[in-house]
Amino acid sequence: MNPHATPVLVLSLALGTTITISSNHWVLAWTGLEINTLAIIPLISKSHHPRAVEAATKYFLTQAAASALVLFSSMTNAWATGQWDITQLNHPTSCLLLTAAIAIKLGLVPFHFWFPEVLQGSPLMTALLLSTLMKFPPLTLLLMTSKSLNPALLTTMALASAALGGWMGLNQTQTRKILAFSSISHLGWIAIILVYNPKLALLTFYLYTIMTSAVFMALNKIKALNLSMILTSWTKTPVLNATLMLVLLSLAGLPPLTGFMPKWLIIQELTKQEMTPAAMAIAMLSLLSLFFYLRLAYHSTITLPPNSSNHMKQWYTSKPPSTPTAILASLSILLLPLSPMIHAIV
C-alpha cells in the first residue's frame, strides 16, 4: 500500500465517525457509516494475504447488509411518521429493523459470526480499530434511539452475547480470536444496560476501549499472534508482559483493577431496575470469559518456554518503550479508586 494512503484512510475513519455521532438526520448518519466501511476495508486487506482479502470481503458484505437495513428502517419510520430525526424513531417495525442492523454492525449475538473471522484476517492495529473505533458510531445510534428500543429483546441478545462470547473463547489459541470473543462478551454488558442507563453504557464502552487498546498495543509490540508467541516473549520484554497480565485481569473485571468498575455499576443499576435474575445471569456468564483471560495472563507471565539449562535470559527489553501503551495500561489498571468521581461526571 502507498505510504500516503494510510493517513488518508485514518482521516476518513475520523470523518465518518464524526459525521455519524454528530448528525441528527438518518441519511447523514448512514453516510458516516458508509465512509467508515469504505475507509477500513483497505486497512483490513493491507497485507494482500488471501485470508486478509477474505476478511475484507466478509466485512464488506455484512456491513453493506447492515447499512441497507439502517436505511430501510429510517425510510419505514419516515413513511409512517413523517420524521427523519434520529431521536423520533417511533414505528415498531423500524425499531426492530434498526436493532437488527446495529446488532449486525456491532457483532452482537446472533449476528456475530463475521466478527471473529474478520479480526483473525486483519493486522493487529486494524483489529484494534475494528474492536473499538468502528463500534462507536453504531453504538451512538443505539444510544440516541434507546427510548424506543425493546428492553426484552436487548436483554436477551445481551445475555446470549455474554454466554457465547465466553463459551467460544475457551478453546481459542489465536490472540485476535480471543479478543474478538472478548469484545462480543463486553458488548453483552453494554447492551443489557443501554435502555436503562445510556450514560453508563457509554462509560462501559469507553473503559472497554482503553483496556482493549492497551492489550492490542502490547500484543503488537511483542508481535504475538497466538499463545505460544506470548509464551516466548517473556524473556525479551518482562515488564511489558507483566503489565499485559494486569491489563488482561482488568478486562476480566477483577476487583482491584479498572475493569471491575463497569461490571459493579451495571449490576447495581440492574438491581435497582428489579432485574436481579438478569444481573445474576450475566455475572455468572462472565466467569466463562474469566477463564480465557486467566489463561492468557498465565501464558504471558507465569509460564516459561522450555529452555536448556545454559540458556541466558535477556533481562533487558529489546524494543524501545511506548508512551501510549504505558498510559493506556496505567489507566486500565489504576482507575478503580476514582470510580465515584467518574460515575458522578458521567
Curated annotation (Swiss-Prot):
Q: What class of enzyme is it?
A: translocase
Provide the gene name from the record. MT-ND2
Q: Name one GO biological process term.
A: mitochondrial electron transport, NADH to ubiquinone
The answer, when asked if Ribosomal protein is one of the entry's keywords, is: no
Look up and give the membrane topology term. Multi-pass membrane protein
Q: What is its EC number?
A: 7.1.1.2
Family stated for the protein in its record: Belongs to the complex I subunit 2 family.
Protein name listed in UniProt: NADH-ubiquinone oxidoreductase chain 2
Annotated keywords: Electron transport, Membrane, Mitochondrion, Mitochondrion inner membrane, NAD, Respiratory chain, Translocase, Transmembrane, Transmembrane helix, Transport, Ubiquinone
Give the catalysed reaction(s), semicolon-separated.
Answer: a ubiquinone + NADH + 5 H(+)(in) = a ubiquinol + NAD(+) + 4 H(+)(out)
Recorded GO terms, molecular function? NADH dehydrogenase (ubiquinone) activity
Q: Where in the cell is it found?
A: Mitochondrion inner membrane
Q: What is its main location?
A: mitochondrion
The transmembrane segments are 1-21, 25-45, 60-80, 95-115, 124-144, 149-169, 178-195, 200-219, 242-262, 274-294, 326-346
Superkingdom of the source? Eukaryota
Q: Per the record, GO CC terms?
A: mitochondrial inner membrane
Briefly state the protein's biological role.
Core subunit of the mitochondrial membrane respiratory chain NADH dehydrogenase (Complex I) that is believed to belong to the minimal assembly required for catalysis. Complex I functions in the transfer of electrons from NADH to the respiratory chain. The immediate electron acceptor for the enzyme is believed to be ubiquinone.
